[in-house]
């Protein structure tokens, strides 16, 4: 775990210096990720029992993360719903884009590309995270990776699909 001095609570919108990098939490809202509903709504005001069961957990405040390394900017959109105003005025070389729940937000990929103008999009949040790391991952219900990749390409952006435990190299000069 992290020591107390390494932890920082944020309400978002403020630049957090992380060495030479800068990080900003952009307030967001959780998408309808499972069966058209927001999973685990609400906040946790006390720690859950240990070990927690799934129904003990809550998602709390949702953020998208803008990360600037000095040379490269990355935005991680971890829910298929977002607040457009929070993304306006920012650009990203790479967007890690949530694959689950996109069918519940019309023009999801188009809106992200229009707002952030990325060169690359990495689909994320597409597997159940329940399979052993050395076995093929299982898709979350409703995720269609080939369709998602086609949608990314149709917006003029290069999709980078990251294999589990794999490495992916790409030309940053394109």
Task: Describe the predicted segments one by one.
Residues 53-110, 115, 119, 123-133:
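Metallo-beta-lactamase
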Residues 8-15, 114, 120-174:
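Binuclear metal-ion centers of metallo-dependent hydrolases, dominated by the metallo-beta-lactamase
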